[in-house]
């Protein structure tokens, strides 16, 4: 089991930048690694000894605090003004952007089980099964550590939306509002089917000593579920070319390039942990009493519109916002203009 490999001490804050003459929307940047209660009990059984959670808080602490969490590839660096390419939500979050950091302080963290500096599996290690509830409990412990009694909102997309719902069920008094984008109270069986094939591919490759190759293939398959059929038709409807006696279709270059990129930065074990966690996700929506805005993308193959309409019907205090995007499930990364109106509700301003 892997702990942090960070260059700062546990339970101590590293001040990345001060608030002296800050850039607008930035303020101080602080990050650290929190030692979670040990052993940390897990929802599906077992526990994690000496578990650690890496976090990053950007902005004026006097502003409303918004927790921003995304898909299983997301991490604590939501945006970064000095190294923009490092921010996983860089097209949506920042000063003057859809999620405007001039109006809130932003808290991110590395998921348990994921690539990053939180506790996760080592190479060839079978990690305990993780639930979205486990991530929610880690977030609650982080808020205790930072002495934040109540946050303004959680903006959660994809897996992050699942964690937001789990937090809302378990710790509703600690958050004023949830924004859930492309995430339901449970996984759709067809989406689980796609992910189960991906996981089987990775496990088979690990047994053959070729885990990275298996992850590359799994990611290539996953890419076919993230975008809409309209986008694939617009981008890749061209004849194949003959390469080395074999036909290569235009879409293959895209899929396998994305697969190689992913396999170069993510370990197979980390992918397996969080992919499984998505499919284990199941919360009781009737117990999420926090006001909740649910954003559904009509073209989303992984989280169908009908599922989110049903979720909103079960949530006691919820509204549904429907958008349309050729980016499908990835719309939360690519549609700042459509998302800005819902982000504008998060700051608590009159």
Task: Kindly give the residue locations of the regions a language model identified.
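N-terminal cap/lid subdomain of alpha/beta-hydrolase-fold enzymes
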Residues: 56, 60-116
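Conserved hydrolase catalytic core segment
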Residues: 150-189
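Flexible "cap/lid" loop of the alpha/beta hydrolase fold
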Residues: 179-208
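Alpha/beta-hydrolase
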Residues: 198-290
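Catalytic His-Asp charge-relay segment
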Residues: 289-296, 320
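Conserved alpha/beta-hydrolase "acid-adjacent" motif
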Residues: 301-307
């Amino acid at each position: 089991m892997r702990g942090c490999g960070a260059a700062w001490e546990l339970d101590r804050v590293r001040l990345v930048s001060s608030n002296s003459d800050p850039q607008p929307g930035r303020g101080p940047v602080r990050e650290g690694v929190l030692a979670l209660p040990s052993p940390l009990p897990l929802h599906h059984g077992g526990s994690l000894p000496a578990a650690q959670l890496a976090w990053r808080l950007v902005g004026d602490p006097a502003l409303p605090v918004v927790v921003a969490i995304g898909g299983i590839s997301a991490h604590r660096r939501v945006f970064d003004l000095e190294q923009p390419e490092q921010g996983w939500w860089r097209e949506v979050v920042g000063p003057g952007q859809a999620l405007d950091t001039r109006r809130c302080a932003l808290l991110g963290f590395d998921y348990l089980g994921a690539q990053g500096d939180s506790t996760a599996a080592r190479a060839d290690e079978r990690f305990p099964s993780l639930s979205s509830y486990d991530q929610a409990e880690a977030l609650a412990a982080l808020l205790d550590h930072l002495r934040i009694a109540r946050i303004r909102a959680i903006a959660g997309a994809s897996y992050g939306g699942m964690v937001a719902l789990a937090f809302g069920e378990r710790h509703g008094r600690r958050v004023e509002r949830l924004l859930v984008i492309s995430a339901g109270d449970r996984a759709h069986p067809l989406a689980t089917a796609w992910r189960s094939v991906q996981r089987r591919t990775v496990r088979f490759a690990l047994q053959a000593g070729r885990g990275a190759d298996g992850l590359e293939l799994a990611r290539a398959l996953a890419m076919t579920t993230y975008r809409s059929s309209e986008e694939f038709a617009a981008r890749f409807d061209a004849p194949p070319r003959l390469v080395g006696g074999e036909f290569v279709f235009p879409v293959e270059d895209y899929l396998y390039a994305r697969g190689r990129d992913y396999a170069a930065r993510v370990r197979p074990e980390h992918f397996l942990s969080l992919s499984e966690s998505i499919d284990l996700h199941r919360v009781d929506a009737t117990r999420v009493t926090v006001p909740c805005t649910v954003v559904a993308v009509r073209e989303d193959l992984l989280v169908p519109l009908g599922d989110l309409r049903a979720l909103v019907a079960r949530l006691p205090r919820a509204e549904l916002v429907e958008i349309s995007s050729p980016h499908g499930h990835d719309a939360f990364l690519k549609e700042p203009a459509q998302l800005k109106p819902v982000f504008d509700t998060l700051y608590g301003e009159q």
